[in-house]
Amino acid sequence: IIESVGEGVTDVAPGDHVLPVFTGECKECAHCKSAESNMCDLLRINTDRGVMIGDGKSRFSINGKPIYHFVGTSTFSEYTVMHVGCVAKINPQAPLDKVCVLSCGISTGLGASINVAKPPKGSTVAVFGLGAVGLAAAEGARIAGASRIIGVDLNPSRFEEARKFGCTEFVNPKDHNKPVQEVLAEMTNGGVDRSVECTGNINAMIQAFECVHDGWGVAVLVGVPHKDAEFKTHPMNFLNERTLKGTFFGNYKPRTDLPNVVELYMKKELEVEKFITHSVPFAEINKAFDLMA
């Protein structure tokens, strides 16, 4: 909830309900003016900045020593100071303890399916990695109308939970003596229509691309790989009209689009509650990290 605003801020006011976002939307740069991009020149994620853009200084300190901002949001605190371009004003009726999860990973996976993969109704989608982002990608495929959603994960204990998010079938690569892209091709008469990769493992990224059907298949990469990783595939995979795409924050523009994602929840089209397994008081934040391990 906005407590106060700085000079010149007109888009939000004290009392407004907002979602803080690690990336932003200045609404002035070429990316913000493009209907295709959310990679704001001014406010895109910068993990090294640690200060406010306007004056290059931190707004936090302890015993006179500065504490630097964390990914532009510093939300591991009860009060924070942010650039107005990194807060999305939302419906004040939306429960903040639920829709807060839309500030990062859930929107990333959801948008990867809905905005980037864009599976046609009745299509088949493979989701690689069934962590929170992957489950959100499955949820996005469900909302889009995919009829088969195949979860791919090395941890079979995740499969039952993934059914709640629309997954209809599962593949554990360890159960097969052939590449998983071949397994998926055999299951789907030549390949899936769409795939969404949510692990960041370079081998899974390649598999996610090579498992899509020639002629119309689209693979979307969400996971962040190791900085030295190299994506290698045969050029014929492209010449046979497979498409490879990347995405950042589900292609959502934070200020423009997140209010609409919240409305999906308010209209009961997006089921946020099933992403939440525990609630802990702020004083036990480290316990929350332990629960995610």
UniProtKB/Swiss-Prot annotation:
An example Gene Ontology biological process: formaldehyde catabolic process
Co-factor binding comment: Binds 2 Zn(2+) ions per subunit.
Recorded catalytic activity of this chain's protein: a primary alcohol + NAD(+) = an aldehyde + NADH + H(+); a secondary alcohol + NAD(+) = a ketone + NADH + H(+)
Record-listed E.C. numbers: 1.1.1.1
GO cellular component, one term: cytosol
Positions contributing to NAD(+) binding: 129-134, 153, 158, 199, 222-224, 249
Requisite cofactors: Zn(2+)
UniProt-listed Pfam families: ADH_N, ADH_zinc_N
Enzyme class (EC, first level): oxidoreductase
InterPro entries per UniProt: ADH-like_C, ADH-like_N, GroES-like_sf, NAD(P)-bd_dom_sf
Locations listed in the record: Cytoplasm
Residues binding Zn(2+) 1: 104
Keywords: Cytoplasm, Metal-binding, NAD, Oxidoreductase, Zinc
GO MF terms held by the record: alcohol dehydrogenase (NAD+) activity; S-(hydroxymethyl)glutathione dehydrogenase [NAD(P)+] activity; zinc ion binding
Subunit relationships: Homodimer.
Protein name (database record): Alcohol dehydrogenase 1
